[in-house]
Swiss-Prot record:
Record's keyword annotation contains NAD: yes
Residue ranges constituting the RCK C-terminal domain according to the UniProt record: 144-225
Classification via PROSITE patterns: RCK_C (PS51202), RCK_N (PS51201)
GO CC terms of this entry: plasma membrane
InterPro entries listed in its UniProt record: K_uptake_TrkA, NAD(P)-bd_dom_sf, RCK_C, RCK_C_sf, RCK_N, Trk_Ktr_HKT_K-transport
Domain notes: The RCK N-terminal domain binds NAD and possibly other effectors. This is expected to cause a conformation change that regulates potassium transport.
The protein's name: Trk system potassium uptake protein trkA homolog 1
Described purpose of this protein according to its UniProt entry: Part of a potassium transport system.
Amino acid sequence: MKAVIIGAGEVGYHIAKALSPKNDVVIIDKDEEAAKRADELDVLVIEGNGANAEILSRVLQNADLLVAVTGVDEVNIVACMTAKLIMKNKNGWKDTKTIARVSNPDYIDSPVTSRAQVGVDLMICPELALASEVADILSSPSAIDAEMFAEGKVRMTEFAISPESKLVGKHMQDLKLADCCIVSAVFREDQIIIPHGDDLIKANDHMVVVGKPESMEDLESVFGSKVSHRTRILLIGCGIVGMYLAKLIDKEENADLRIIEHSKSRCIEVAEILENALVLNGDGTDVSLLREENIEDMDVVVAVTDSDEKNLLCSLLAKQLGAKKVIARADRSDYLPLFEMVGIDMAVSPREATVNEVLKLTMGRGIQTLTTIEGERAEIIEYTASEKSRIVGKPLNKVKFPKGAP
């Protein structure tokens, strides 16, 4: 497969890194430093404007995929539109699939959508995808990750087993889970374990549970502590990600949401939109403000400002002041291990959603959903078996899954 990637920032770089081992990849960026970094990969790097028709004409022939992921929505959309026009005027050229990264809510109102009529086969909003991911996690206060599959019919939730947990030392078969729930994987240090009933649960294990959403409501009492009150959430930062997330939380009856935003005008705007949230004008690193809001009583603190450094500082302060759980946004991939190293419960990245959607398109027919967990240590793939599939009619224990897959 041949892929053309426009934009060599965090998202573009990681898409290129994921695709380059088995595909022909061209990456275009007008920034000299970004292009130089991309040159470290086994890809063809072109320094220039990715929306330029002349440059696109040179690289689009035989391309299966064009992904525009610069930091400017309009550049990404124009690049896709231009690519479609070029292909339309070239006899014999294949119809390249186009994907645009878009952040402006005026252009998109769901994490992934299609605008094929204007030349964009797929629009992906990393910020909205991130907000949806965090909202899923917040529905289980003890969870460190959560994803929905099969159009909401199946839920994956990941829990961390603390050294003080009552589960430490018990066998897997002793877990009192609903009939429709199973532990599908355990992450233990650098190992990924497919568990069996006689396996022991150890401190610091990360356990992945899959099941029907309605059957997983009691998991809090198994893996965490059942919250008897409305979940108290403090959101620091109400930019694009924060606003998307606040709207999702604001709809939940069992959530008590407070927001700290440094921009006074943004506070006024947010307060007019949200019905149930308390919006505070201030700085998330202001210790006196955090204490005034009784941060030690917060079930979850979520830091999603546009600055990784500020999110890290806010999160560290929140943990030090007694917040039960802290989730922080980290745009830079090299920061993700740092966040977890210093004790932040969970670091989330907007780029992963975009990378996952692009990878899904390269993995062949039948792939409905693809997501990574544990910092890309593992992939979860939702696959639809066609009528002609070789696995139809076979018991699951007779299917030869790839090595390392359950």
